[in-house]
């Protein structure tokens, strides 16, 4: 793609004909536009509702919102909620309705999409680190991961995500650098830098969860040596198998949802893309929306404490609607440890 081109909302004139360079990126056929509109609308709505429900459950529970683990999960839900709304709306407006904005507005939109997805991956990394500390340092976990430190980590992560994502809006555009084959006004060197940053985040997630699984395996092996006659084999392997299933699911979802789009972004840096590849990238991009839709199930709905808080909320709303007031019973049994800590203790 050639260098800087003017894409202001007021189209230029070339021999009396309207000229809009943005149309070079609007390559979907009518059938593909319908598919994109339907898929983005349905997945965006479902993902937004799921993540909004998780946010409400955590923030409405005084017990949950005080725990660092659930602060990280609420950050993930917030990022995925914003990603669902911002990405779905802007993606449909651009590819289906061919909406064209001024350079600044367009860069603001694409920066917002980038920020929400970057913050989502950053929240996944903080959640992975939290689980690592919880499993590997259970006696000192509460002293290491306080609510204040969790909030500081989240603030740093969100500020860094915003700073990196809005660099094009602050002037890092393809003028005169070569423009990306996939994103208008975005230079290839910025795209390369963002890909490297995301690769670092994913490497941190994979390494952290891999180390957690290895540590759990050693923990189970140690128990087996000291309690071979007292602890049945199935019970000894319970933590190992449970963590392996959970971490396998986490990594499989990340790989399926993110790798196709990231691979095509990297491919665009070294070669010229055909329209067919660009069309494939448009649909691969929607897999990131699938990730935002699946995250609440993996990280929130599988948590016993969140399910208990959700049940309490439903009981409260039911009584409220029946005219009995919002007061209900106390939230489920109080626990001073997170789900991961409980797994370690039962093993």
Swiss-Prot record:
The modification Phosphoserine is found at residues 335-336. InterPro entries: Canbinoid_rcpt_2, Cnbnoid_rcpt, GPCR_Rhodpsn, GPCR_Rhodpsn_7TM. PROSITE patterns: G_PROTEIN_RECEP_F1_1, G_PROTEIN_RECEP_F1_2. It is found in: Cell membrane; Cell projection, Dendrite; Perikaryon. One of its GO terms (cellular component) is synapse. Heterotrimeric G protein-coupled receptor for endocannabinoid 2-arachidonoylglycerol mediating inhibition of adenylate cyclase. May function in inflammatory response, nociceptive transmission and bone homeostasis. This is Cannabinoid receptor 2.
């Amino acid at each position: 793609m050639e260098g800087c081109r003017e894409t202001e909302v007021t189209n230029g004139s070339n021999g009396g004909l309207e000229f809009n360079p943005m149309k070079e990126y609007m390559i979907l056929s009518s059938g593909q536009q319908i598919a994109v509109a339907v898929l983005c609308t349905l997945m965006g709505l479902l993902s937004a509702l799921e993540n909004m429900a998780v946010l409400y459950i955590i923030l409405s529970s005084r017990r949950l919102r005080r725990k660092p683990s659930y602060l990280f999960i609420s950050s993930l839900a917030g990022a995925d909620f914003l990603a669902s709304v911002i990405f779905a709306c802007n993606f449909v407006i651009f590819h289906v309705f061919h909406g064209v904005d001024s350079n600044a507005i367009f860069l603001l939109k694409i920066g917002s999409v980038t920020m929400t997805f970057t913050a989502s991956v950053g929240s996944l990394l903080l959640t992975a680190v939290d689980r690592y500390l919880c499993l590997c340092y259970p006696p000192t976990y509460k002293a290491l991961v306080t609510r204040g430190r969790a909030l500081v980590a989240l603030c740093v992560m969100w500020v860094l995500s915003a700073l990196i994502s809005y660099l094009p809006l602050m002037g890092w555009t393809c003028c005169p650098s070569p423009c990306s084959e996939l994103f208008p006004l975005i230079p290839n060197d910025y795209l390369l830098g963002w890909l490297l940053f995301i690769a670092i985040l994913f490497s941190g997630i994979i390494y952290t969860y891999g180390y957690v699984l290895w540590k759990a395996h050693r923990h189970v092996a140690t128990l087996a040596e000291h309690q071979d006659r007292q602890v049945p084999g199935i019970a000894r392997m319970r933590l190992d198998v449970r963590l392996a299933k959970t971490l396998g699911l986490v990594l499989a979802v990340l790989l399926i949802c993110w790798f196709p789009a990231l691979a095509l972004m990297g491919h665009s840096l070294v070669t010229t893309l055909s329209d067919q590849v660009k069309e494939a990238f448009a649909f691969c991009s929607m897999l990131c929306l699938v990730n935002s839709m699946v995250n609440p199930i993996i990280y929130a709905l599988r948590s016993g404490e969140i399910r208990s808080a959700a049940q309490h909320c439903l009981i409260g709303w039911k009584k409220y609607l029946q005219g009995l007031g919002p007061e209900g019973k106390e939230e489920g049994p109080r626990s001073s440890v997170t789900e991961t800590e409980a797994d370690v203790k039962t093993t």
